[in-house]
Amino acid sequence: MQRETVFDLIGVGFGPSNLALAVRLAERSGAHTLAHCFVERQPAFGWHRGMLLDDCRMQISFLKDLVTMRDPKSRYTFINYLFERGRLNEFVNLKNFYPTRVEFHDYLSWVADAFDDRVHYSETVLGIEPVRGDGARIDALRVLSRDAAGHERQRVTRALSVGVGGTPAIPDAFAALGRDRVIHSSSYLTDIDRLVASPDGERRRVAVIGAGQSAAEVFIDLARRFPHVDANLVMRAGALKPADDSPFVNEIFSPEFTDVVYAQPQDARRALLERYRDTNYAVVDRPLIEQIYEMLYLQRIDGTPRHALLANSAIEAAVRTADGRIELTLRDRMSGATRIERFDALVLATGYRRDTHSALLEGLAPHLGDALTRGDVTRDYLLATPEHFAPRIYLQGCCEDSHGRPTRCCRSWRAVRTKSARRSKTGSRPRTMKAWPGPRTKND
C-alpha cells in the first residue's frame, strides 16, 4: 500500500457535479494552490452512457451547461466547445436550444479531458475513515480506494465532495428474476442487443416498466429499431403526462427558489416539492408523447398492432415460468380486474436511488451523530457535523428533500467553498430569508 498523500479536497466520483467543481477550482483565483483530486470508478468520463440514444435530445437549454449561468466568459462553455470543434456556425443554423444527448455528452467529455491530471480513473472508493487528532477530535478523512489492477491507495483530505450519482432502483418484485431477462434502463444500450436476440427468428415480446422520459425513449427505440420485437409500455398511470417546462414554472430551478425551499419547515417543503413534481418525475417531453401516439395510431391502419401501451396497470406479481419467460400479474387500477401477461424480457425504467452516499460514509457514522441519518445539510450542501469533526463533507445530487429539485444546470460550484477559514457547524435554518422574487418583469 502506497504512502498517504494529504489533500485539501478530494472529490468522490467525477460526474457533472464534481466536473463543474473542477471547472470552478480551475478558474478561481488562487485555487491553483489548493491540493485536490477526484477518484472515479469508470475507466473514462461517462454520463448516462446506457441512454445515449442517437435521436434523443437534452431537456434543458445548452445555456445551462457546466458554467455559462455563472460565467459566460469561461472557456468551458458549450458555445466555446462548439467553436473549438469547428461546429459553431452549423449549430446556430439549427436554430435549436436543445442539443442531442450524444453531443452534450461529447461536450462534457471535452471539458473532462482538461482535468485528466486531476482524475484517478478506474479506482473504486472502498471506504472513508476518520483521521484522529487530539482527544476525540477528527482532523481529516482517509479515502481508501482500489484500482483496476487491485492495488490499494490511501489519500488523506481535509474536505470531501461526494458526487457519486444515483444507483438504479430495482423494485422488490423484480429483484429475483435474473439479469438474463431483466435490465435497468441505465444499461439499455449496453445490454439490449443481448436481451432481445432471436437466433431462431421468433418474435420477442418486451415490457418496458415506467411512465417517465426514459421509459418512453426505450419504448419507441424498441419499436423502431428491432423489427422482431413487440414492445409494451406498462405503467400505473392512466396516460403519459407531459413535463411542465413552462417559463413561470421553470423559475423553480433558480438559486432564489432553492433559498425558499430550504427555509421552509419540513411539511411545507414536502408539499412545495410535490406541487412541482410534474417538472421532473413520471413525465415525458410532449413531442415524444406525440410520436408514440402517432406510432400506435398508424398500427391501426394496416391492422398489425405490434406495440401497446398498458396503462392503469399495477404489477401485483412477477415470476419466471418454466420456459424462462416472465409472467406479470397486472391489476387494472380502474376496475380492479387482474390479468396475466407474459414477456420474453423486461426493461426497468424505474429511476434511481439517491442514498449511495450513506453507504460510502458508513465508516464515519459513529463520529457524525445524527447528521447522516437525518440528512442534516446546510444551505451550502455541507453535512452538518459535530464540533469535534473538523473535515468538511459536501453532498452533491442527494439533497432534494432539503433543497428542492436539482437545478437544470450543473451548479455544484455554489456548493463547495474552497476556503477553510469559515464553515457552518450546524444545520439550522437561517433566521431571516428574503422571499423568492418570482419572475422578473419589465418594471424590475
Swiss-Prot record:
Catalytic activity: L-ornithine + NADPH + O2 = N(5)-hydroxy-L-ornithine + NADP(+) + H2O
Pfam family, any one: Lys_Orn_oxgnase
Pathway(s) per entry: Siderophore biosynthesis; ornibactin biosynthesis
EC assignment: 1.14.13.195
Record keywords, A-Z: FAD, Flavoprotein, Monooxygenase, NADP, Oxidoreductase
Protein task: Catalyzes the conversion of L-ornithine to N(5)-hydroxyornithine, the first step in the biosynthesis of all hydroxamate-containing siderophores, such as ornibactin.
Protein's UniProt name: L-ornithine N(5)-monooxygenase
